[in-house]
């Protein structure tokens, strides 16, 4: 039964994560600590692409994108700690779990699976300087 659960979880993660690779030529990015004026407002974020920690040397990353006002053209993209982004959405979805639609319950399960796939062991072989936190403008 556990094998079937792992298989289904892998399929769901594949459905949600793999399509982002076609939209993102290089999924591994540097997480940068930004000044307040450069942060994306939550209501302006149009897309969030999660990257599996297996893709970027043990690092779980996310791309937060925002279009130009009144346009479909992507103009702002920020790299974030994917584990923090996943944790944030898990927390939000769990707070209203009794009112979730089927799609949101499926998303919650997928996010929990993605979160559960992260382990400290992944970092043992990682090049910790490659995607290090940088102070940005």
UniProtKB/Swiss-Prot annotation:
This is Envelope glycoprotein L. Disulfide bonds join 28-56, 29-79. The keyword Glycoprotein applies. The heterodimer glycoprotein H-glycoprotein L is required for the fusion of viral and plasma membranes leading to virus entry into the host cell. Acts as a functional inhibitor of gH and maintains gH in an inhibited form. Upon binding to host integrins, gL dissociates from gH leading to activation of the viral fusion glycoproteins gB and gH. The heterodimer gH/gL targets also host EPHA2 to promote viral entry. The gene is gL. Interacts with glycoprotein H (gH); this interaction is necessary for the correct processing and cell surface expression of gH. The heterodimer gH/gL seems to interact with gB trimers during fusion. The heterodimer gH/gL interacts with host EPHA2 to facilitate virus internalization and fusion. InterPro entries: Herpes_gL_rhadinovirus, Herpes_gL_rhadinovirus_sf, HSV_GL_alphagamma. Pfam families: Phage_glycop_gL. GO terms for cellular component: host cell Golgi apparatus; host cell plasma membrane; membrane; viral envelope; virion membrane.
């Amino acid at each position: 039964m556990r094998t079937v659960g792992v298989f289904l979880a892998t399929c769901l993660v594949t459905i949600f994560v793999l399509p982002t690779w076609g939209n993102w030529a290089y999924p591994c990015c540097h997480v940068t600590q930004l000044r307040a004026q450069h942060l994306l407002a939550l209501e302006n974020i149009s897309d969030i692409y999660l990257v599996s920690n297996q893709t970027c040397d043990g690092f779980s990353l996310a791309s937060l994108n925002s279009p130009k006002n009144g346009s479909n053209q992507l103009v702002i993209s920020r790299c974030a700690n994917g584990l923090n982004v996943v944790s944030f959405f898990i927390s939000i979805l769990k707070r209203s779990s009794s009112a979730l639609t089927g799609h949101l319950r499926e998303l919650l399960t997928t996010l929990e699976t993605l979160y559960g796939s992260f382990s400290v062991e992944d970092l043992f072989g990682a090049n910790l300087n490659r995607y290090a936190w940088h102070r940005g403008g």
